[in-house]
Amino acid sequence: MAATDLERFSNAEAEPRSLSLGGHVGFDSLPDQLVSKSVTQGFSFNILCVGETGIGKSTLMNTLFNTTFETEEASHHEACVRLRPQTYDLQESNVQLKLTIVDAVGFGDQINKDESYRPIVDYIDAQFENYLQEELKIRRSLFDYHDTRIHVCLYFITPTGHSLKSLDLVTMKKLDSKVNIIPIIAKADTISKSELHKFKIKIMGELVSNGVQIYQFPTDDEAVAEINAVMNAHLPFAVVGSTEEVKVGNKLVRARQYPWGVVQVENENHCDFVKLREMLIRVNMEDLREQTHSRHYELYRRCKLEEMGFQDSDGDSQPFSLQETYEAKRKEFLSELQRKEEEMRQMFVNKVKETELELKEKERELHEKFEHLKRVHQEEKRKVEEKRRELEEETNAFNRRKAAVEALQSQALHATSQQPLRKDKDKKKASGWSSIYSVTIP
């Protein structure tokens, strides 16, 4: 009996019963309540404009919303790509719209364009992170939170008439998983209709072959399925922007005046501006907001929560509570910390051993060098002693010879001084004898 009741309760949870009402209750006014609440709260819509400097991003925004936004003139000498968001409060009838236009200033102006997409990706992720942090707060206030997540990226393509640039393909590939991309051909009045048609086909072919996922207007809603299906075939839109009014016939229209004629912005035979405005604002603005939240933000949120250790439970297993997730992550961090500490300790021990070996090797080298220098010193000392002895012997011999020479010199001087005295004596003796002889012999 208990098993039967359990099965009955399980089936009741899986398949709720449909009941008929006996009279009017009043919850059929829920759509009206939702509309009233939404109108009171207002809406936010955030557009990211990516394209080369001077391609007409600001002009197109002014044309789309039929107003003049205050923007700074951008130069072609930006050192890097920077994102410049500007927020405006718009009102049409009783609907308030907080519009944020984010311009990728300096995109494509650098010589090295390898990392031109990086600031754009970082900005989109930063807005997702801000929203996630608001969601994770204990006291959160999403009702008053200004949602800055990018709802659509209008990617402006230079009208070369040939093919997409490598920078365009790389950037759109990096962005397609983070934002709804609508490619548009800017300044479409600079190429002929035949060239424009071929250019569109070429662009779509390159996007498909390179796996770039652009935003497709939804066809699951019967109310807009037909028009969206038709508009999907016109992508990318070839647009012309202008805030100047030119008189055509008896009325003033927004157009661009050329010597050869007038290009009317809202003439669908001249460009796709009206198609872009209808698809972007009138028909699919809410779907762009919904896709941003349910697809792109959810992907970012899921990756972040998985990094934090959260995961969905399997169908057969019990769901994980926040405490269990916290404890599991805490144990994981502690084990990782212990592993890191052990690695650092082992690294320190190995480093100490290596240092000790190096010190011992240095000590051995210094000892060998000392012994070598000691031997060299002793050898030099021995040689110096030998030289000293030889010098002393030579000095003694020199002194002896000097003494002998001095003795001989003194003897010679003595002998030289005695010889004149003998000569004088001899002379005197001779003269004496001669006088004697002279006396005896007359």
UniProtKB/Swiss-Prot annotation:
Residues with the Phosphoserine modification: S10
Keywords: Acetylation, Cell projection, Coiled coil, Cytoplasm, Cytoplasmic vesicle, Cytoskeleton, GTP-binding, Membrane, Nucleotide-binding, Phosphoprotein, Synapse
Natural source organism: Callithrix jacchus (White-tufted-ear marmoset)
GO cellular component: axon; cytoskeleton; presynapse; synaptic vesicle membrane
Compartments, record wording: Cytoplasm; Cytoplasm, Cytoskeleton; Synapse; Cell projection, Axon
GO BP annotation list: regulation of intracellular protein transport; regulation of protein stability; regulation of SNARE complex assembly
Region G4 motif, annotated ranges: 186-189
Keyword presence, Mitochondrion: no
Chain intervals for the UniProt region annotation (G3 motif): 103-106
Record-level Gene Ontology MF annotations: GTP binding
SUPFAM superfamilies: P-loop containing nucleoside triphosphate hydrolases
Cysteine disulfide partners in this protein: none
Domain Septin-type G: 41-307
Protein name as catalogued: Septin-8
Composition bias, Basic and acidic residues: 377-391
Family (UniProt): Belongs to the TRAFAC class TrmE-Era-EngA-EngB-Septin-like GTPase superfamily. Septin GTPase family.
Sequence segments annotated as region (Disordered): 377-442
Region spans: G1 motif: 51-58
Gene that produces this protein: SEPTIN8
Subunit (UniProt): Septins polymerize into heterooligomeric protein complexes that form filaments, and can associate with cellular membranes, actin filaments and microtubules. GTPase activity is required for filament formation. Interacts with CDK14, SEPTIN4, SEPTIN5 and SEPTIN7. Interacts with VAMP2; the interaction inhibits interaction of VAMP2 with SYP. Interacts with STX1A.
Domain of life: Eukaryota
Binding positions (GTP): 51-58, 106, 187-195, 241, 256
Function: Filament-forming cytoskeletal GTPase. May play a role in platelet secretion. Seems to participate in the process of SNARE complex formation in synaptic vesicles.
